Amino acid sequence: MSKESSFDIVSKVELAEVNNAIQTALKEIENRFDFKGSKSSISLEKEELVLVSDDDFKLSQVKDILLGKLVKRDVPIKNLDYGKIEPAAGGTVRQRAKLVQGIDKDNAKKINSIIKDTGLKVKTQIQDDQIRVTGKSKDELQQIINAIRKADLPLEVQFINYR
């Protein structure tokens, strides 16, 4: 049995789920008593979330509400890269959060070193924003998946195309 097995390591955020989480968070913000009359909003511009509120405290509450809704929808919150809080129009404050899609070179190298540290005989290929892992044994590939899941990576990864 010389047929090789493989899988791909990717880091993706489902934009439809992010949109659903934003809608439910906005409903909660509309209905909460402490947000009555506030200018709080959440919007999705391309692959960037924009959070706006009256002040820093309300902005942090909006962020907490959104994070709760994202977690309920299984959206990886590790893949949010927050910018700094900046003043916006009308005395409000704004914060942008970039949705990280794909694995950048630095994280690909980290994942590659985790795979090498296992000492298993597998091959890795970095392909744009994903990593392909190929090996003869499916058991070895399962061990690689477990090692990567246990590692503390700065972004959430998914394993697809397992053959």
Swiss-Prot record:
Belongs to the YajQ family. One of its GO terms (molecular function) is nucleotide binding. Keywords: Nucleotide-binding. This is Nucleotide-binding protein BBR47_25280. Nucleotide-binding protein. InterPro entries: DUF520, UPF0234-like_C, UPF0234_N, YajQ-like_sf. CDD domains: YajQ_like (cd11740). PANTHER family: UPF0234 PROTEIN YAJQ. Transmembrane segments: none annotated. It comes from Brevibacillus brevis (strain 47 / JCM 6285 / NBRC 100599). The keyword Disulfide bond does not apply. The keyword Nucleotide-binding applies. One of its GO terms (cellular component) is cytosol.
